[in-house]
């Protein structure tokens, strides 16, 4: 029994040393500029830039693609990327400011299929199989990736109207989103406390 323990321990040490050596010898060096740009991007993996995630978009930027495609990152991200690359910040003339939207699930039509939950890159949708789902407005980036997979078309994208109360002041403030119920009554959803 002791002999078996010693043999297994020696094998574990030998294989551990081989793996440690291989990880150092076969290490692939990443482009540090790509890593810096990827760290600045919002990591929502929403695909609004035309790439499947933030890392591929960072690589495309280093290969000469436009730096203005990240909608969730906004102007601040564009300025930071321009600083890293040492280029001028492109003018935003002719480029419309995207309308900020939040997904809303009509809970009377939701069948609980969980397809929207699987599609959401930021886990802004909560619910379980065969039960109603709902959206957490603070987490929703408005990427619309949850709309297409929904078989009952119960997900609507509602524009968030900017006013003095819900504008992004960069400090803890309440976000009020007007929500129209199915019965026609209107209520206000307060988030961000």
UniProtKB/Swiss-Prot annotation:
- Source taxonomy: Bacteria, Pseudomonadati, Pseudomonadota, Gammaproteobacteria, Pasteurellales
Which BP terms in the Gene Ontology apply to this protein? electron transport chain
Q: Which GO terms describe its molecular function?
A: 4 iron, 4 sulfur cluster binding; electron transfer activity; metal ion binding
Map out region (Hydrophobic) in residue numbers. 1-23
Positions contributing to [4Fe-4S] cluster 2 binding: 110, 113, 116, 150
To which protein family does this belong? Belongs to the 4Fe4S bacterial-type ferredoxin family. RnfB subfamily.
Q: Please indicate which superkingdom the organism of origin belongs to.
A: Bacteria
Query: Binding of [4Fe-4S] cluster 3: at which residues?
Result: 120, 140, 143, 146
Tell me the cofactors it needs: [4Fe-4S] cluster
The record's subcellular locations are: Cell inner membrane
Keyword ATP-binding in annotation: no
Q: Which NCBIfam families match?
A: PRK05113.1 (NF003475), rnfB (TIGR01944)
4Fe-4S ferredoxin-type domain: residues covered: 101-130, 131-160
Name of the encoding gene: rnfB
| Family matches, as InterPro entries | 4Fe-4S_dom, 4Fe4S_Fe-S-bd, 4Fe4S_Fe_S_CS, Elect_transpt_cplx_RnfB/RsxB, RnfB/RsxB_Proteobac, RnfB_subfamily
Query: What is the free-text note on the cofactor?
Result: Binds 3 [4Fe-4S] clusters.
Q: How does it assemble?
A: The complex is composed of six subunits: RnfA, RnfB, RnfC, RnfD, RnfE and RnfG.
Q: What is this protein called?
A: Ion-translocating oxidoreductase complex subunit B
Q: Where does [4Fe-4S] cluster 1 bind?
A: 46, 49, 54, 70
EC number(s) stated in the UniProt entry for this protein: 7.-.-.-
Q: Which GO terms describe its cellular component?
A: plasma membrane
